[in-house]
Amino acid sequence: MKYFVVALALVAAFACIAESKPAESEHELAEVEEENELADLEDAVWLEDLADLSDLEETRGFFGNAWKKIKGKAEKFFRKKAAKIIAKKEGITKEEAEAKVDTMSKKQIKVYLLKHYGKKALQKASEKL
């Protein structure tokens, strides 16, 4: 709501500035009136669009929840991927690897995956050379 008030104040200020310009002849006066009418129409459209965005708090909440869901799914994916890599690398069962991953922090899991895939990318790059 406060964004709407600020935008309305800016529009009013620009309208006052535009109307305060002196018009020297009738031709210029007609031209200024035409410009003001066009500006008023543009402002009306802009304010209408701004009114549609008045539900910004609700929109922010929606994307915040969506981001949290995506982040949660990514963390689950990282855990599964790390467990799979550990099981393959160390020759242990999947359950043992998952238990090992559960003892790791989120940061440790991400670092482990970055190291693993970094080494893999480096090996592929060196093979191409």
UniProtKB/Swiss-Prot annotation:
Function: Insecticidal, cytolytic and antimicrobial peptide. Has insecticidal activity against the flesh fly S.carnaria. Has antibacterial activity against the Gram-negative bacteria E.coli. Forms voltage-dependent, ion-permeable channels in membranes. At high concentration causes cell membrane lysis.
Localization annotation: Secreted
GO CC entries: extracellular region
Pro-sequence residue ranges: 21-60
Organism of this sequence: Lachesana tarabaevi (Spider)
Protein name: M-zodatoxin-Lt8h
Tissue and organ expression note: Expressed by the venom gland.
GO molecular function (one): toxin activity
Keywords (A to Z) from UniProt: Antibiotic, Antimicrobial, Cytolysis, Hemolysis, Secreted, Signal, Toxin
GO biological process, one term: defense response to Gram-negative bacterium
Gene name of this polypeptide: cit 1-11
Region forming the signal peptide: 1-20
Family: Belongs to the cationic peptide 06 (cytoinsectotoxin) family.
